[in-house]
Amino acid sequence: MIGYISDNILLPILDFFYGLVPSYGLAIVALTVVIRLALFPLSAGSIRSARRMRIAQPAMKKRQDEIKSRYAKDPQKQQEELGKVMKEFGNPLSGCLPLLVQMPILFALFATLRGSPFADVPYLVNLKVLPSDQIAAIEPKPFTSSKHSIFISETKHFPVIASLPSGTKLGVGDKAQIKLQTLTGESFTSRLSGVEGGTKFTPTWSVTKGDDLVKVSADGTVQALAEGDATVQGKIPGLAAQSGFLFIKALGQVGFYVDGEINWDIAILVGGFGLTLLVSQILSGRGLPANPQQSTANKITPVMITGMFLFFPLPAGVLLYMVIANIFQAGQTFLLSREALPENLQKILNDQLSKPALATEAIGGSDRLPFEPKKRSK
């Protein structure tokens, strides 16, 4: 499903925006905004549900505990009363369905930005080398990899797979060629003939595991040297992997610290992701009673995730998408936090905020945002 969404929905949208303004950086921004706008109703439902459940949860839990205690010996009546409470306050899991529906689209968007044209596309083939006297008894099972759409120009792309007709099991001393080809069986290199600058898409081959067990030549031919498990990788360069955007040196660049040097563009993107995530989480609790555990999680989570992405190998184009998506999410959360609540929930919230301890500790209980300076008292 993810591949279908990427090839038939996201890539055509990407082609459209690149046709309007020939900048892959702007195309990423536009694609992110369009997808987020399309998913707005679903994500808004999740945000509303989370906000309402956070308000209702204390009163809801109190009612549920009372019912369980009162009707402990009458399970049927207990379930009936619990159902009434659920109907009054809403199902805590109701916000999960919109989130689950949009996940395939978000995963497809993520996968699209990790592939061609924004990054080099790897094809991994796991091989098993057996003794030469055993391989004869094994029936060959042809291998084909997952397909990836490869851009060979700004608007021309097609799916490419890796194929090994003799299968992934080789005998010591055997040779086999891994072929990169289209779904119709046409060689990838033959599709490059006649393409201006086509040589820059020539695949490179390497052994990523077990380099003492197999070796691979420039045309993808593998020779088995010794028994064991090995992995061979073929990599097709991304068309826009070296294209820059604003302060980003290359959209396909990976890594915060590479070859002894800090990539400051990656550092800025990761820092921007952490900051926008923090703002979004602060806004999600605006005007609600303080929850010490939630407040601590809101502060720690962005720091942990940001630290992880400093060393997680994500291309700059993917990080750009994540920052733009977080900005959109923060704006959406701010707007929804100003929506009127149902009468019963508003009454519960007013009661919660009327308590001195909660009122003084409420997160964003006033109109002032958490990051705005306090007004001076007269």
Swiss-Prot record:
GO CC entries: plasma membrane
Chief site of localization: membrane
Localization per record: Cell inner membrane
Molecular function (Gene Ontology), one example: membrane insertase activity
Membrane topology designation: Multi-pass membrane protein
TM region positions: 20-42, 93-113, 264-284, 304-324
Domain of life: Bacteria
GO BP: protein insertion into membrane; protein transport
Record's keyword terms, sorted: Cell inner membrane, Cell membrane, Chaperone, Membrane, Protein transport, Transmembrane, Transmembrane helix, Transport
Subunit relationships: Interacts with the Sec translocase complex via SecD. Specifically interacts with transmembrane segments of nascent integral membrane proteins during membrane integration.
Function: Required for the insertion and/or proper folding and/or complex formation of integral membrane proteins into the membrane. Involved in integration of membrane proteins that insert both dependently and independently of the Sec translocase complex, as well as at least some lipoproteins. Aids folding of multispanning membrane proteins. Probably also aids protein insertion, folding and/or assembly of membrane complexes destined for the thylakoid.
Family note: Belongs to the OXA1/ALB3/YidC family. Type 1 subfamily.
Name of the molecule in the record: Membrane protein insertase YidC
